[in-house]
């Protein structure tokens, strides 16, 4: 069945639709070594940042354009190393996928080597794939970011004030998997386009800031304009 917002079309297409030759139908939990929510931060640890030399924490707001994008070290929350040592199972490694489970449900990022060893916020879910599993991380990341998948997650979000989706529900997400070589090609192609979008968005942002600064200076007579 397809709803007006497409929220159930993913279930229908994966469960009952035709699948191209060589493709597979799987549930997300079948593809992952673990589907794990991040640890809670104790009140005593609040206020510490990466600049203090502690272990930094990825926040939901850091998931932008399928990447982890953090602010200056002084703005990145962190956990004392002595406590972080007991949370090794929560430390990120390259190829992990982070998904926001509260607030803006479905926001996601593919973790790169830059953030290996970081921790992640309890408002995020980490998907860790087995080394020899059937799913390619880059492909799964773009699949999770597709409109149909995002609609599926939003439709299953609970809470009228702050939407949230459970790890159990997320694990039931239906996934279509092409052969490994196709997964790699699809993932790399769309990831390259995501990077182009990110770069152009940054250019637009910087240009906008320059325009505002220049306009204020010109309108205040800070520069002499020659016709």
Predicted regions located by residue number:
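A short beta-sheet element
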Residues: 101-142
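Short, charged/polar surface micro-motifs in flexible loops or helix N-caps
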Residues: 63-66, 84, 97, 104-106, ...
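Non-catalytic DNA-recognition/assembly elements of restriction-modification systems
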Residues: 1-45, 179-227
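Sequence-specific dsDNA recognition surfaces
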Residues: 29-45, 62-94
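Glycine- and charge-enriched low-complexity intrinsically disordered segments
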Residues: 132-159
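A short glycine-rich beta-alpha junction/loop motif
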Residues: 118-123, 159-185
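Short hydrophobic-aromatic micro-motifs
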Residues: 56-59, 92, 98-100
């Amino acid at each position: 069945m397809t709803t007006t917002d497409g929220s159930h079309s993913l279930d229908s297409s994966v469960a009952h639709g035709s699948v191209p030759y060589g493709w597979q139908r799987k549930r997300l939990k079948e593809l992952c070594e673990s589907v794990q929510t991040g640890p809670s931060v104790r009140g005593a640890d609040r206020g510490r940042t990466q600049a203090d030399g502690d272990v930094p924490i990825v926040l939901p707001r850091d998931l932008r354009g399928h990447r982890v994008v953090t602010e200056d070290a002084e703005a990145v929350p962190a956990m004392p190393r002595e406590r972080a040592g007991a949370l090794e199972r929560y430390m990120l490694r390259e190829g992990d996928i982070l998904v926001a489970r509260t607030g803006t449900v479905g926001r996601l990022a593919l973790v790169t080597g830059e953030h290996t060893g970081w921790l992640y916020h309890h408002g995020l879910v980490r998907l860790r794939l087995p080394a020899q599993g059937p799913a390619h991380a880059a492909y799964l990341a773009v699949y999770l970011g597709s409109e149909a998948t995002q609609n599926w997650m939003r439709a299953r979000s609970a809470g009228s004030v702050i939407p949230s989706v459970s790890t159990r529900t997320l694990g039931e997400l239906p996934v279509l998997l092409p052969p490994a070589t196709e997964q790699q090609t699809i993932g790399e192609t769309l990831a390259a386009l995501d990077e182009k979008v990110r770069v152009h968005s940054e250019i637009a942002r910087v240009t906008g800031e320059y325009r505002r600064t220049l306009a204020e200076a010109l309108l205040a007579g800070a520069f002499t304009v020659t016709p």
